[in-house]
């Protein structure tokens, strides 16, 4: 029986099967090269489009349709936010199709997909893989460097701010623990309470308060010091001053034998001679400490008697009891002047000697000798 003649359709199918076989062989050897084509051809740009047309085998071995375009945007969008890097999605069926010769179709089943087609293919059991482009890798490599450069000044600013906060906290803590000298802060409340507060007693020797209130302010301390000084000045002004008396016996100063007797109320019994330019006219004064600003003065003549000098000294010193006069300064010791009729010259009074007026006490006894 003769074999049936081939129809034109069977010839077309046989040629197409042979072409697919050859294409699969070529595709399996150059598969790695074909996958790198998008990486070598892609360049980093703000916006670019890529059209991928892949043959897709149908149930009857026909050529597949053209897939829609997949747009990949740059890493930085127009609004300033970073978008995920563009990727080329390729899908391969889990069960690859076989031709009439039971040979696999190779890369003919892989195709470029959009993000909308990925869920549909995953639901059908198709494996979906993403391949980043070269431009994407370049952008991703530059991003960490820029991020590091941006983090360095931010870190420096944050470090400086942390140091400032730490310094302020440390100063606040030290201000609470230590007292820092500075200008006095005067508040109006100090003027209102100045009459109510008790002033601190002041020691004028070193100008330090002996006892003060715990809540007293520097203003109250200064005010109390001022008032204490003011009171002391007023007390000195109100104290009666000692009268400076110049008792004269009516004799001229040029007369020879004139003697000056200075008497002090605090030590009324002592009289000391004071040398003058004229040896014939010795002057007498009280050598002891005095509370008066200036001692009382009395002038005597060398011819005045001892009784006259004693009576005058009693009047000046306000002596009411019995008294006696001593001559002090002799090499032999002090000498009692018992003769009131002799003169001072006859008594041997010379320069460097003293007269001592001794008063009897209330019991009628003389003070014991030194």
UniProtKB/Swiss-Prot annotation:
Tissue-level expression reads: Testis-specific. In the testis, expressed only in germ cells and not in somatic cells. Expression starts in late primary spermatocytes in stage X-XII tubules and gradually increases towards step 1-3 spermatids in stage I-III tubules. Expression then declines continuously and disappears after step 7 spermatids in stage VII tubules (at protein level).
- The coiled-coil regions, if any, are none
Cell location: Cytoplasm; Membrane; Golgi apparatus; Mitochondrion intermembrane space
Q: Where is the composition biased (Polar residues)?
A: 31-49
The keyword Membrane is annotated on this UniProt entry: yes
Q: Give a yes or no for keyword Cytoplasm in this entry.
A: yes
Stretch list, region Required for induction of mitochondrial fragmentation: 225-370
Basic and acidic residues: compositionally biased ranges: 250-260
- What's in the keyword line of the UniProt record? Cytoplasm, Developmental protein, Differentiation, Golgi apparatus, Membrane, Mitochondrion, Spermatogenesis
The UniProt subunit note reads as follows:
Interacts with CCDC159. Interacts with isoform 1 and isoform 2 of GGN.
Question: What is the protein named?
Answer: Gametogenetin-binding protein 1
**Species of origin:** Mus musculus (Mouse)
Q: Which gene encodes it?
A: Ggnbp1
């Amino acid at each position: 029986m003769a074999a049936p003649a081939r129809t034109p359709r069977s010839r077309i199918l046989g040629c197409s099967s042979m072409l697919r076989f050859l294409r699969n062989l070529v595709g399996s050897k150059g598969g790695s090269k074909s996958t790198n084509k998008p990486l070598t051809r892609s360049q980093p740009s703000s916006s670019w489009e890529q059209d991928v047309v892949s043959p897709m085998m149908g149930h009857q071995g026909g050529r597949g349709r053209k897939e829609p375009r997949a747009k990949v945007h740059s890493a930085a969008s127009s609004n300033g936010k970073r978008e995920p890097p563009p990727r080329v999605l390729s899908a391969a069926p889990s069960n690859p199709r076989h031709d009439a010769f039971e040979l696999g179709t190779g890369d003919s089943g892989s195709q470029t997909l959009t993000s909308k087609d990925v869920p549909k293919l995953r639901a059908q059991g198709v494996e979906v893989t993403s391949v980043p482009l070269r431009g994407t890798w370049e952008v991703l490599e530059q991003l960490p460097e820029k991020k590091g450069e941006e983090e360095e000044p931010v870190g420096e600013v944050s470090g400086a701010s942390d140091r400032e906060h730490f310094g302020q906290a440390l100063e606040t803590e030290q201000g609470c623990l230590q007292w820092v000298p500075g200008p006095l802060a005067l508040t109006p409340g100090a003027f209102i309470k100045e009459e109510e507060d008790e002033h601190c007693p002041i020691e004028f020797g070193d100008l330090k308060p002996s006892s003060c209130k715990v809540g007293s302010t520097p203003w109250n301390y200064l005010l109390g010091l001022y008032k204490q000084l003011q009171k002391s000045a007023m007390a000195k002004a109100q104290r009666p001053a000692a009268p400076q008396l110049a008792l004269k016996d009516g004799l001229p100063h040029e007369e020879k034998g004139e003697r000056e007797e200075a008497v002090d109320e605090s030590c009324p019994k002592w009289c000391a001679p004071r040398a003058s330019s004229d040896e014939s006219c010795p002057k007498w004064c009280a050598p002891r400490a005095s509370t008066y600003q200036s001692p009382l003065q009395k002038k005597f003549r060398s011819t005045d008697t001892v009784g006259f000098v004693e009576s005058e000294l009693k009047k000046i010193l306000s002596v009411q009891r019995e008294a006696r006069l001593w001559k002090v300064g002799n090499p032999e010791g002090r000498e009692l002047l018992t003769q009131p009729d002799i003169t001072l010259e006859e008594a041997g009074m010379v320069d460097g000697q003293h007269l001592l007026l001794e008063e009897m006490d209330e019991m009628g006894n003389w003070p014991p000798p030194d």
